[in-house]
Amino acid sequence: MGKKYTESVKLVDKNTLYTVQEAIELVTKTSKAKFDETVELAVRLGVDPRHADQQVRGAVVLPHGTGKTVRVLVFAKGDKVNEAQEAGADFVGAEELVEKIQKENWFDFDVVVATPDMMGVVGRLGRVLGPKGLMPNPKSGTVTFDVAKAIADIKAGKVEYRVDKTAIIHVPIGKSSFGEEKLSDNFHVLMEAVVKAKPAAAKGQYIKSVAISSTMGPGIKINPGKVLE
């Protein structure tokens, strides 16, 4: 472990459940790397992801974005090609992009948007896009004819959240350089979205544990009963 990490760990009591404000203050103090570290939120939920009626997924636009430049690939045809290009898509195409991905193992993009009429074509990429979390999905707003809005939202800082096999959601909420106020705004918008997405089938305590950390910093636990304060 590096000296900076050891110093950061000393600032955090791993047995304490901090308030949101205390945790965000600490995460900015424990971010000591030479690059602008990403601040990530991890939320463990009281759901069983093996059941279809206990899936938690969705998307939300963070008020201050993520601080990351997002490359958007759009599968479209006809008028929608121009609409996507004008809205700022980084790559737009159809079958030729499917082939490029299949033959060249090309993944120079972060989000994929598709018009509904292209899903038959995009479906052929399910095996390669699915495991990378890149498959377009109506629930997250990435399968739509309104490609301009989808691109604008993504570029503005839209993040997708999805519970993994261990019932945890991992989402970036910004960069350490954002400062406490912006990180706090992003945190609250995201947590409100996750709370609203609670499946009817989920029983008992929904928000089991919450923690934030910077890329190279230690995890900082937050009191799960106070995340919306």
Curated annotation (Swiss-Prot):
InterPro entries xrefs: Ribosom_uL1_bac-type (IPR005878), Ribosomal_uL1 (IPR002143), Ribosomal_uL1-like (IPR023674), Ribosomal_uL1/biogenesis (IPR028364), Ribosomal_uL1_3-a/b-sand (IPR016095), Ribosomal_uL1_CS (IPR023673)
GO cellular component terms, A-Z: large ribosomal subunit
Q: Which GO terms describe its molecular function?
A: rRNA binding; structural constituent of ribosome; tRNA binding
Keywords in alphabetical order, please: Repressor, Ribonucleoprotein, Ribosomal protein, RNA-binding, rRNA-binding, Translation regulation, tRNA-binding
Matching entries from Gene3D superfamilies are given as:
3.30.190.20, 3.40.50.790
Q: Does the keyword Repressor apply?
A: yes
A Pfam family it matches: Ribosomal_L1
- What's a BP term from Gene Ontology annotated to this protein? translation
Q: Does the keyword RNA-binding apply?
A: yes
Q: Which residues form a coiled coil?
A: none
Report the function annotation for this chain.
Binds directly to 23S rRNA. The L1 stalk is quite mobile in the ribosome, and is involved in E site tRNA release. Protein L1 is also a translational repressor protein, it controls the translation of the L11 operon by binding to its mRNA.
Query: What family does the Swiss-Prot or TrEMBL record give for this protein?
Result: Belongs to the universal ribosomal protein uL1 family.
Task: Describe, as the record does, how this protein assembles with itself and its partners.
Answer: Part of the 50S ribosomal subunit.
State the name under which the record lists this protein: Large ribosomal subunit protein uL1
Its source organism is: Clostridium botulinum (strain Hall / ATCC 3502 / NCTC 13319 / Type A)
Q: What is the lineage of its organism?
A: Bacteria, Bacillati, Bacillota, Clostridia, Eubacteriales
